[in-house]
Amino acid sequence: MATPVVLPDGKKVAIDLLSADLPDVHVMGRLPEGAALNAALPVVRVLRIGGVADVRGWADPANRDNPRFSIDCYAAAEDQAMRLAQRVCAAWELLKGRDTADGIVTGISQETGPQDRPEDPNADMARVGMTLGMSVSPPRSTS
């Protein structure tokens, strides 16, 4: 009987690597509520919005996941949110080949570039977002 391949949590890989590349930014999967969000700015939120596993052989299990993410960049002003989004895109371009304890990035994609995603007009922040993708495989074996 074949041993199933447990694919890495691509969202965790993305958050961990972006956090390392953007040490002055709070990178997370869930936003704090109310005033706590304003206090945490600048913030990058990573939401998995889809993607499927692939690279199946004739009788082999999947060994790569291809998550797609909606990435939202929050800052105090529109120009700051756009600049943060550009920094995220620049960091994303360099993720291929990097790894964490959870997995290795084997490919990246940018499906939409930074775009305005207006918040409530009464909010004291701006949001710019984009759709990014990656391919992740289980960590390399050290044995």
Where is each model-derived feature located?
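Small/polar-rich, solvent-exposed N-terminal microdomains that initiate assembly or binding
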Residues: 1-59, 100-101, 142-143
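Charge-dense, low-complexity intrinsically disordered segments
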Residues: 1-5, 75, 122
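Generic detector of contiguous secondary-structure segments
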Residues: 29-34, 69-72, 92
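Short glycine/proline-enriched loop/turn "hinge" motifs that connect secondary-structure elements
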Residues: 58-63, 122-124
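Oligomerization/assembly interface segments of phage tail-like spikes and tubes
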Residues: 63-81, 88, 126-137
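Short, hydrophobic/π-rich interface segment
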Residues: 82-96
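Acidic-leaning, charged glycine-interspersed low-complexity segments
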Residues: 92-143
